[in-house]
């Protein structure tokens, strides 16, 4: 059961993941710091930061966004999982956040909208982000929370909740059927 599904939340025990954060929005601030350090060291590294749309109602996200724009961090790519749900329910009911694309664009980011379940479109979005110069990029990936798992799809109550063994097995089976 060594997968994200079995834990309910992310972890840092993967070589490609330098840190995992969450709903308080510290992840983007850390990513901005890493992107600045990479530029200062001429390391040529790209920094990727995955955000949930529930955490962008935190002020720290917008402070980090302003900083990324100010320093023209074109080595920073933010991916926003825009599924419309957070732990407390629907985004528009909890935070009232609207026009996400416009907000990030107004802060000076290159905005790329994509179907987050379409792998070829995601690859194209990452290629575009890599070629973008002078500004940070955000890929807004429109997704469905729990897509492909009948009892999880579109349900906020599965946020941060690990499934029981029988639920886990059913979820894995449904996901396998979906990719065959």
List each model region and its residues.
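Glycine-rich ThDP/TPP pyrophosphate-binding loop and its adjacent helix/strand module
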Residues: 11-180
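Single conserved hydrophobic/aromatic residue that forms the stacking wall/gate
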Residues: 2-13
